[in-house]
Every structure is written in C-alpha cells, then in structure tokens.
Amino acid sequence: MNMTGGGAGPQAGPNSSCNIPNSSLLATAPVAATMPIAQLADGWLELESDPGLFTLLLEDFGCHDVQVEEVYDLQKPIESPYGFIFLFRWIEERRARRKIVETTAEIFVKDEEAISSIFFAQQVVPNSCATHALLSVLLNCNENNLQLGDTLSRLKAHTKGMSPENKGLAIGNTPELACAHNSHAMPQARRRLERTGAGVSSCRFTGEAFHFVSFVPINGQLFELDGLKPYPMNHGGWEDHEDWTDKFRRVMTERLGIATGEQDIRFNLMAVVPDRRIAITHKLKMLRTNQAIVSGTLQKLLKADEQGEGGNGDPQRPDTPSTLLEPSAFTARDLQSLLKNLDTEIAINEQHLADENDRRHKFKVDASRRTHNYDKFICTFLSMLAHQGVLGELVSQHLLPSKKISGQSAANRLNKQSNATANAGATAAGAAGAAPKSQQQQAAAAKNGKSPSKTPGRRRKGRNKCKKRK
C-alpha cells in the first residue's frame, strides 16, 4: 500500500536555526557547501509510504544494519523489531480524531526531565514526518544493538538535552538528512511544493494528508512519538511474561477500532527490524561449520571401519573437536543423515539470502523509476510523433474508435426507429385509402337496388353454374 506521507508542521522561517546551538546544525558536513542552511527547512518534500524507500533512506542516513518491512497481520509474530511506524490519514476536524485526542491527552508525558531523557522531536519542518518517524525509532534504541553511523550518532550527541522544538529544527537543518530525504521523492512532489510555495504542505490545507508516528519501547514502557503532538505519549508497560510487541498489538487494535469508525481503512503499518541478511549470513556460517565437522568425522569413521576390516587391530578413534561426534555416539548412517539435513538447511538459507538480495536490488530499481523525471522523454517522444505526422492518426486509432462505435450504434438505432415509423405510416395510409373505395362500391350497389352484402364475384360464379346446367 503506497500512500504519500506529507505531514505538515509549523513553517520554519529562514532564521529559525538561531535558536539552536551552532554545533547541532552539523554545518561542517560537505553537503552544506552546496545547500544553504537557511533553505534546508523550506525544501523538504513528501515521501511515499513504502518499505523499500524507507530501507534505502536508512542506508543513506548511514545505518546499514536495519531494514523496514510492511506489516499485514498484527497477530503474526515479528522477530526482534526495533519499533513500528504507523501511517494514517490526518483530518483534524473529523470525529475520530477528537476521540483519539481525548484518549491520548491522559497519557501525555509532561515532565521535562523525562522528555529530555528520550529523543522526542517536534515536527517544525513541513513534509519531514517520514524522517522524523525513522529517527524516533533509531535514536531511542540501544547503541550496543544498533550501529547508527556517523551522521545519526553525531545528531544524537548534539541534540542531547535539547527541547523537542530545537530537536526538530536540528533535524530540518541537517544537510545529510535533507538531501537523503529529498533524493527519494517523486518529481510530482517537487512540482507541488513549487506551486504551493516553499515550506507549505499542500495537502495539510486541503484537509487531506497522511502522517507518520512511531511506537518504540523505552525503559520498559511503550511510547508513542508524534511530532505534531506537544508531548510524547506513554502507553504503559507490559506483563512480565509478555513481549513489548504484545502491548503494541493491544494499543494498535484499539487505535484502529477508533480510526476506522467512519469506514476509513487507509492506513499503513511498518516495522523497523534488523537486516535479515545479517542473521541469514550468520546462520549460514554456523551451518557450514557444522557441515565441515560432520563431513570430517564421517570420513574418519569410514576410514577407521576400513582399517578394522583389514585386520589391523582396533580402529583408531578419530580426533574430533566435539565429543558429540565421536564414533561411539553416532554411526556412519547417522552422520550421513545429519549431513544430508545440513545440506538441505544450507540450500534453503542460501535461497533466502538470494531472495533478500533480490529484494534489495528491486528496492533500488523501484527507487530509480520513482525518482526519475519522465516529462522530458514523454514530451520529446510526442513531439517527434507530431513532426512525423503520425500523432493524429495514433490518437484517432486509440481514442476515437470507442466514440465511433457508440456513434454508429446510435445512428443504427435512429435508422431502425425511422424505418419502423415509415412502415407504420405506410400501413396506416394504405388502410385509409382502402376504406373510401369499399364505401363507394357499397353506395353504387345500393343505387342499383342490389344487396350490398353480396359481392359481384359470387354472382358471376352462380351464373356460370346455371349456364352449365342448361
């Protein structure tokens, strides 16, 4: 499901960065030389809600061990997620939003010390909610489990202790983030920004927008981080026998029940998870190590059996790194069966790794198609067709046949109606002409004293019969 997530926020003016310490702007980055700091906050573009786009965006941020997956079933278990990103339709005046605001106002965390201890940034830059949602998940994770990269590590260190508003300005004025964000936008997003004016989100003021929020576990509590809210929201902890994802499922189920009260099902849920290729590669390494151990043990066992059959005394026990693979523990048949299972597992995981690499390649192909501007090609192609004089013929062949067919059918219907009318008129006219003729015959017969009921034809037949009798 691909939807554009603009998510408008208050417009940051050209001098908005003066409220932030200079060290937090990361102006020393090489990209800053080509992009003025004052214009960064005014040029963020809308992004689609696509897991491939978000995965490549994380790579551009410098975080290479993470990927984003779309969640289709809340009840399906997800392995080791860092957090969730929820995209929903944003309409401020709708009834469901008032219900959500009433329920979330009670769980706002207003303690300044608690707010400063986590990474919560208000969205002060329009159209930056996609990057905000990703950073809200990544910068609240344990650094021991996740390698953020230079850009995000520097941003996290420089914004430590800042207010949520200044953190939002720091995000908007970071050149690496702005360039990476805009590099994945469609050309239509740039044209919309130019039409509506810099720094203003077009869909916010038309009442139609999609907004991203993040759900992440922090210190045993489930937090909802929404850059358009004044405070972070604490949904509470979870039971000792539960995982934090169980708590998230309950919260999200309730949220979807409120949000879809008006039959609006346009939402999207994505999970930020570790790169699947890392786990598959680690598993393949372990399987290949076990394969080598089992294969070596099997070869030594077979060799020992051959020596025993040759009458050289007791076979020597093979030297193995594990006592579990001693000949006394496994027979040759057991080792062959185990080796076959390992070969199957290795083939399956190699296929999984190839599938993940193909997915990552497909992400890049889709990104190239998404961000490429086809306007020049289409205009040039149509101009060449018009110059060769074939454009009009192609248009008439592909666009006009339906109109011709409908016009011909209408004409046929009119012709049938006119023919039916003409036939009916002719029949009526014939009937009208025959009536006076019969009336004249009856009048002449009455004048001659003959019965009008007897026809002349019948009288002739009677006379002919009389002549024959004579």
Swiss-Prot record:
- This enzyme's EC code(s): 3.4.19.12
Cite the UCH catalytic domain residue spans from the record.
43-274
Instruction: Using the record's annotation, list all stretches that form the ULD domain.
Output: 373-401
InterPro entries, per database record: Papain-like_cys_pep_sf (IPR038765), Peptidase_C12_UCH (IPR001578), Peptidase_C12_UCH_sf (IPR036959), UCH_C (IPR041507)
Q: Where is the composition biased (Basic residues)?
A: 456-470
The catalysed reaction is:
Thiol-dependent hydrolysis of ester, thioester, amide, peptide and isopeptide bonds formed by the C-terminal Gly of ubiquitin (a 76-residue protein attached to proteins as an intracellular targeting signal)
The cellular component terms of Gene Ontology attached to this UniProt record, alphabetical and capped at eight, are:
chromatin; cytoplasm; PR-DUB complex
What is the protein name stated in its UniProt record?
Answer: Ubiquitin carboxyl-terminal hydrolase calypso
